[in-house]
Amino acid sequence: LSAKERFTALTSGEIDVLARNTTWTLSRDADIGLTFVGVNFYDGQGFMVRKNSGINSVNDFKNGISACTNTGTTTELNMRDFFNSKNIKYEPIAFEKADEVVQAYDAGRCDTYTTDKSGLAAQRTKMSNPDEHKVLPETISKEPLGPVVRQGDAVWEDIVRWSLNTMIE
């Protein structure tokens, strides 16, 4: 499921549990009718650049930088907030599917690729020349990730929560 499709699939009953890189946020918890049952991983958003770009830190970003990411994600919002906080004018390039983001970045359509750092590490392996890319050291967010269920089914919520707890212990 794409980031755009995931919540509809869960709320419609197409799936019973969403277990992927979905950040637990107040608005998602309160507004969409979802219940986050716990956290199984804390990630953080970062940036990947080409090693030959001369960029070694987010402090090296300049006005006009283009940044690829997934649409409909906290990553997209964090990216906007980050660049605005640094007064950097940037060109957002957003795609629905992660593979589209990877292909666009790999083809040179954007200067940087941003998502959770675990995702950057994994997606880097899909590049045509993975060793030509690096993840910058800065982390611009803290992302609590874990399974999500529809609100209103306390028994199923308990099953998923205790399954998660068992795996963590």
What are the roles of these predicted feature ranges?
Residues 1, 23, 43-100, 118:
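Bilobed "Venus flytrap"/periplasmic-binding protein-like clamshell domains
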Residues 28-32, 78-79, 102-104, 123-124, ...:
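Short, charged, surface-exposed secondary-structure boundary motifs
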Residues 49-55, 59-62, 71-73, 119-120, ...:
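Extended ligand-binding regions for polar small-molecule ligands
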Residues 5-9, 98-104, 110, 119-120:
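Short, hydrophobic alpha-helical packing/hinge segments within bilobed ligand-binding/sensory domains
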Residues 92, 130-131, 153-157:
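A residue-level marker of the well-folded mature domains of exported/periplasmic proteins
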Residues 11-15, 23, 52, 66, ...:
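Sec-exported extracytoplasmic/periplasmic mature domains
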Residues 1-60, 118-141:
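Acidic, polar ligand-binding/catalytic clefts
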Residues 18, 48, 66-70, 113, ...:
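Short, well-ordered beta-strand segments
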